[in-house]
Structure formats: structure tokens, C-alpha cells
């Protein structure tokens, strides 16, 4: 077996953080992640099945780990060493193709009765991520026992697997999991009919969120921010009515919503600098998760509006007075589970994701494929995808020479 392996190594983690601050993605060259070759792993339990990845996507959470930027909040929720990778399309032993739903819920941990969230179908909120028959881990790709998608093989519980329709390409299938995240965020936003929604960030997560908003909700206007030309073009194609640079978002929301602006007068800006609005968008979905993006969201959301944080944040510094003064709702949108559609129907997020990937042709977001041997270059490409005109970067393990290392 060949696999990427992330170990607990504080000095190398610190080195990765320094390198990642200099050049995003370069933590792969200095941090505690290595390409290893070894014996095939043992199944974590009798019901678990072996999956041989075909494509495995690189997620923003993977990049945060590689560059030493992931929150220490997760330390007790993972088990070392682990193999990253949770955006996976692969083959079972009978060669049928499956997509992984990576959350390690009560069902996969053989815990009965399930916790309240799992019992309600909200497996992303499982309360037992450190318990049961397998080691700690919120998802495949953070659990020592299961392995992960950045390998020639790993194990999954049958409850985690979804069959891939024959008409789906591998590139379409590998987009199902990230698309499910965008759908969950779009539906969690509870956008009023004919409301105004702003999406901050137009990387992969921003793009699938825009697509989900257009297909499953009914906003009057979608405004999105994009930094690079390719992002702007695709955001418009997938359903954004207005695409602006991050620096123009306040002005754009002001124009669309017809709200007033407030100037902040200071010694550095004696004539005043507009940095907030009296009104704003009904909902803002933050697909970045930085101090700047959350601060922008607080500035452009109308009083009693809602901010949905879907981009994974780390440690941020924020002025939270607007949250209090404007009585805003700030909620997180993590993974997926069971969704409630505007018409009251309940349905699996992954069922919706298969539908949306097909309808919106989201396989177009897959920009480049790399072998595991080239993992350092792949991670650097993924970390700088926007500036290089790319979106989703994946590992390609379809070549049998990749799967059968002598």
C-alpha cells in the first residue's frame, strides 16, 4: 500500500507553519506528512469494506493541516498517525464505484442507541466522535483506524458509501462531497424568497454554494466576491447575479439593497472611510473563514440578518460589537446529513449533491490531477489554486501501477 501519512510531530508542525506562512502549500515539504509504503491495513471491524480510491480531492481542511494552520480545537478529535483525504470516489472489490460520505457517525462506530443528532439524521453533529469501536476522528481522513483517500486503499463502513451512477465520470463523482457541503450551507441560510444573499469567496466551496443557492433557494439577488478572473467567470455561470472583488463588496451590497453607509472618521482618515452599512444583505455566506471575511460579513448583513460560516476558520481576531448591536445570527455550516427543503421535504444532502453535480456540470471544477508521488507539488497547486486559474486539485490513483506497489 502507498499512502500519505500525517504524524504527531510538534517540531515539524512548527516548521510547516513557518513555511506555509511564506508560501501556501509549502508545509508539505517541511511538515509531519510523508509518503509511505507498507502492508495493507486491517479492517476496523467485521462490517467494514475496502475501498480503492480512483480520485481523491484536496480540501481546504487538508491544506490547513499541511501548513500548520488547523485549529487546536481538533486535536482531541483526531487519532495519529492518520491518512488524509475525505473527498473520494473509489472501487469496491467487485469494481463497482462508490462515493464516500466521510462522517464517522454512531452507525459506523457501532454505537446503539445513536446520539440525538445521529438519530435525527444530522450525522455531522455526532456526539460520539471519540467513542465506539474505532479511534477518535470526526471523519475518514482524520482517524487512524480507517485510513483515508490519499492512499491506494482504505476502509469504509457501508453506511458511508453511495453508489455512483454509470453516467457519472470520476471527475463528477469526486465533486459530490464538496457539493454536499455547499448545499448544506445554502439551506442552513434560510434565505427569504426574493431576499439578497452575499457569498464571500469563489474558490471551490464558494462556487458550489452559489450553484446550490441558485438551484435550491429563491433569492432575488446573489452577490459574490471573487479575486481572480476564472473565479469571476465561473461564479457568474453558476448563478451569481453580481460578481465583485472583495474590496467592492460593501459598495455593491449598498447599491443593491439601497441602504445608507456610515463613515468612520479617524486621524488616519479625517474625511471618513465607509466601513459599514445601516442595512445590508438578508444573508451572508462566508466561504473563506478569515478575520477579514467575517468582519466584512458583520459589516454588510442587515440588522436581524444571518451570517453562515462555511469556510473553516482558525484563530481569528474580531470586533463583535456589530453582532450584538445589529442582533445578527452567526451560525456554522459543517458537513451535511439530512436537509429540509423550502417545501418541507426532507432528503439526504448527498442525494441533492448527486442531482446538483449532474445538473450544473460541476465536474468542470476539477482542474488538475496528480499522482501521490507528486504530493508536494499537488498540495502547493491546491493552496495557490485561485492565482493559478484552478479550483479543485485531486490525486489520481486510477493507474494500477499506483495501486500495486512492489
Region locations from a protein language model:
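Glycine-rich phosphate-binding loop and adjacent beta-alpha segment
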Residues: 236, 291-355, 396-406
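NAD(P)H dinucleotide-binding glycine-rich loop of Rossmann-like/cofactor-binding domains
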Residues: 75, 86, 106-200
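C-terminal hydrophobic helical "lid"/dimerization subdomain
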Residues: 272-273, 295-298, 346-406
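Glycine-rich beta-strand-centered segment in the early N-terminal region that forms part
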Residues: 39-56, 71-120, 124, 165-167
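Residues at the starts of beta-strands that form the adenosine-phosphate
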Residues: 196, 220-222, 306, 329
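Adenosine-nucleotide cofactor-binding segment
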Residues: 199-202, 207, 214-292
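C-terminal substrate-binding/catalytic core of Rossmann-like NAD(P)-dependent dehydrogenases/reductases
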Residues: 254-274, 278, 317-368, 377
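Glycine-rich helix-loop-beta junction characteristic of Rossmann-like nucleotide cofactor-binding loops
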Residues: 187-192, 215, 276, 299-300
Amino acid at each position: 500500500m502507498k499512502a500519505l501519512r500525517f504524524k504527531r510531530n510538534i517540531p515539524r508542525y512548527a516548521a510547516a507553519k513557518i513555511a506555509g506562512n511564506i508560501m501556501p502549500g509549502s508545509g508539505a515539504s517541511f511538515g509531519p506528512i510523508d509518503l509511505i509504503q507498507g502492508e495493507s491495513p486491517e479492517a476496523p471491524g467485521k462490517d467494514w469494506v475496502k475501498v480503492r480510491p480512483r480520485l481523491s480531492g484536496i480540501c481546504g481542511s487538508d491544506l490547513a493541516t499541511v501548513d500548520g494552520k488547523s485549529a487546536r480545537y481538533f486535536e482531541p478529535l483526531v487519532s495519529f498517525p492518520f491518512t488524509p483525504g475525505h473527498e473520494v470516489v473509489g472501487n469496491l472489490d467487485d469494481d463497482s464505484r462508490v462515493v464516500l460520505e466521510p462522517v464517522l457517525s454512531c452507525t459506523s462506530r457501532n454505537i446503539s442507541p445513536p446520539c440525538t443528532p445521529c438519530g435525527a439524521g444530522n450525522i455531522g453533529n455526532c456526539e460520539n466522535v471519540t467513542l465506539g469501536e474505532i479511534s477518535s476522528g470526526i471523519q475518514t481522513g482524520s482517524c487512524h483506524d480507517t485510513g483515508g483517500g490519499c492512499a491506494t486503499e482504505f476502509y469504509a463502513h457501508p453506511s458511508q458509501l453511495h453508489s455512483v451512477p454509470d453516467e457519472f465520470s470520476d471527475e463528477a463523482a469526486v465533486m459530490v462531497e464538496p457539493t454536499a457541503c455547499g448545499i448544506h450551507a445554502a439551506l442552513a441560510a434560510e434565505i427569504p424568497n426574493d431576499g439578497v444573499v452575499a457569498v464571500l469567496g469563489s474558490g471551490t466551496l464558494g462556487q458550489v454554494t452559489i450553484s446550490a443557492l441558485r438551484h435550491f433557494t429563491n433569492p432575488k439577488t446573489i452577490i459574490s466576491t471573487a479575486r481572480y478572473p476564472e473565479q469571476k467567470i465561473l461564479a457568474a455561470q453558476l448563478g451569481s447575479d453580481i460578481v465583485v472583488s472583495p474590496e467592492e463588496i460593501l459598495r455593491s451590497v449598498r447599491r443593491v439593497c439601497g441602504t445608507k453607509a456610515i463613515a468612520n472618521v479617524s486621524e488616519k482618515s479625517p474625511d471618513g472611510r465607509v466601513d459599514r452599512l445601516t442595512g445590508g444583505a438578508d444573508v451572508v455566506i462566508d466561504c473563506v473563514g478569515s478575520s477579514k471575511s467575517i468582519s466584512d460579513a458583520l459589516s454588510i448583513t442587515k440588522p436581524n440578518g444571518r451570517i453562515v460560516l462555511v469556510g473553516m476558520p482558525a484563530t481569528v481576531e474580531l470586533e463583535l460589537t456589530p453582532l450584538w448591536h445589529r442582533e445578527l445570527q452567526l451560525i456554522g455550516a459543517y458537513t451535511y446529513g439530512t436537509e429540509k427543503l423550502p417545501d418541507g421535504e426532507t432528503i439526504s444532502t448527498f442525494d441533492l449533491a448527486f442531482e446538483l453535480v449532474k445538473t450544473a456540470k460541476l465536474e468542470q471544477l476539477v482542474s488538475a490531477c496528480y499522482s501521490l508521488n507528486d504530493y508536494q507539488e499537488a498540495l502547493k497547486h491546491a493552496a495557490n489554486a485561485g492565482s493559478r486559474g484552478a479550483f479543485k486539485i485531486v490525486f489520481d490513483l486510477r493507474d494500477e501501477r499506483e495501486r500495486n506497489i512492489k
